[in-house]
Amino acid sequence: IYLEPKDSLMLRLNTWDFDESLVFAGVGAERNNILIDCFLEDEKEKKAFFTYNKLKPEKFIHKVDSLTALKFKTFEHYLENHPKETAGFGEILKTALTYPLYARAEKYPIMYAKFSKTGSFPDLDASFFNYRNNISINKDALIYYPPYSQYIRNYLYNETYALGHPPVKKTYSSKFTFDLLSTIDKKIVNKKSKNAFLKQTVVSHFYNKSSCVLNKKPFDKFFELSTSPKDKKHVQQIINDSKAVVKNQMIKDFSVIDYANSTRSITEIIKGKNAMLFFWNQEYYPKNYIASRIKQLSNTYPNIIYIQIEIDGNYKNTIKKIDVKNQFFIDKNSEAQTFLTSKMPRCILVNKIGKVTNGYASFSSYNINQYLKVLNEN
């Protein structure tokens, strides 16, 4: 939602068809309605780019240039009909229209490699990136606006690949993460934006790996480059949490509370079973995603019991559509708090004899599958 002084917005929507039905009315409505149109158009273009990403560079960039020209026509038409429009909204609208295309152009090399038979990057000449001449990567006011931040993220990854890294297949190497952090430090000027990208990178790469093995060099680089005490403290908590549950050691018992509000022992709940303990909070995962993901994992790996444990939860906050008997929460007195100081979600995989097989897996990462497969078969 875009608001300026004296705006007064009302919105209407149908919850069964959320995005397509969202309409604004009132002062400032036209601005927000065209931004919604940009979002919906971008959703359609995502599907088209699955095909475009397989094209040779010349044909791909021709598609991008053609679509960009249409976006600029839309932009010019809007300004012609709104001659008194503010410069601030003009910048937002131009970003909403064009930056998703620029972001896809930045991501094209890795997507092309993914679909090509050789698995290699395409050969690109310098003119491929001519659109960069129209872009500033240090617009601090836009850094949390998704069309802009996604472009910057893709650009930073592209610049890091250009240092000679091969296409990433599953997990980012320690060296790639290290170099990406250095690229962020070099390219991003604003301290707040730089710190945000540094933290997002080191944490997301650790989670993507979905392993309790810590790569020291990227974390050391993060601590060297970040100037945010708050971010440093949080990342250190994640590191400490990871070290607190050790692979190939027996899971330490801790108390959980069920939804009859009774205190239970986790080792008794999972005794003799292969188990995935998923610690969650609503800041990171919505309930509908958790329900869908648990159902998918249960169907794929049926020999595992899936236990959901809400961090700092309460007995009223159940997740619908999954078995309430496997849902628990912990309060501030639970022994589990010793390895959840960051309050970040995590999965702990435990085998039938109570031994930890993975102490810090990511619920949403594709890379958790290899660990679940082994656990399911033993």
Per-region residue spans from a language model:
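A non-transmembrane, solvent-exposed segment enriched in polar/low-complexity residues
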Residues: 1-84
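N-terminal, charged low-complexity regulatory/assembly segments
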Residues: 48-179, 183
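Alpha-helical repeat scaffolds
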Residues: 113-132, 176-185, 214-224, 232, ...
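Charge-dense, extended regions
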Residues: 169-200, 204, 208, 212-241, ...
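N-terminal "domain-start" segment that seeds a small globular fold
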Residues: 232-267
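Short active-site neighborhood of thiol/selenol oxidoreductases, capturing the structured segment around
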Residues: 264-294, 307
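Short, internal strand/loop/helix patches
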Residues: 319-353
